[in-house]
């Protein structure tokens, strides 16, 4: 009996880490738009994306490292720790909206996001950058320059881009909560489709690269 327990302990010690290592991670690194603001966590697009991922790619999991109110500077300060903790293969980077709403300089937003991307790349994490837009009352020049940040970063760092997280409903009031800023539960289903379209392609490409002979 003692020998049997020793064998079981040996198997658990060496096989369990292998099983854990086979699970790959997608980390969502964002603000309140990704943190289920104003609704149950299970109703948010990240939870819906998790369900989709578990159905289509069972060897992947999602970690939501989003914080309501987060800025690009805040993300820059905590990205290293998040990468060390979760070791994601893919990072969905959804930051910048709060900076824009507060009128932060275009230069600071760009540089903070660029630093986050560079750190992710150094840690061998692919980046899926999520673009945002601002309401027109922030001025034509500022809103245009803000919107241009995301495609510029995607081109400069050769990373995947979702041009606008709220594509298809960004100007439709019925898809927003009472504050007029945060998407409601109905809109979450639209967001997950927007994200999934790009994410699934990244995962498929990664699988092909990992198993070129299959």
Which residues fall in each region the model found?
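Positively charged n-region of N-terminal signal peptides that target proteins for export
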Residues: 1-4
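Bacterial N-terminal signal peptides
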Residues: 6-14
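Alpha-helical transmembrane segments and their juxtamembrane interfaces
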Residues: 12-13, 41, 194
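Residues in and immediately flanking transmembrane alpha helices
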Residues: 15-16, 44, 197
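Serine-esterase "nucleophile elbow" of acetyl-processing enzymes
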Residues: 19-68, 78-87
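Alpha-helical cap/lid subdomain in secreted, periplasmic
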Residues: 21, 48-51, 76-214
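Short histidine/acidic/glycine/proline-rich micro-motifs that form metal-
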Residues: 33-36, 40, 66-70, 98-100, ...
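Alpha-helical elements of the RecA-like P-loop NTPase motor core of helicases
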Residues: 73
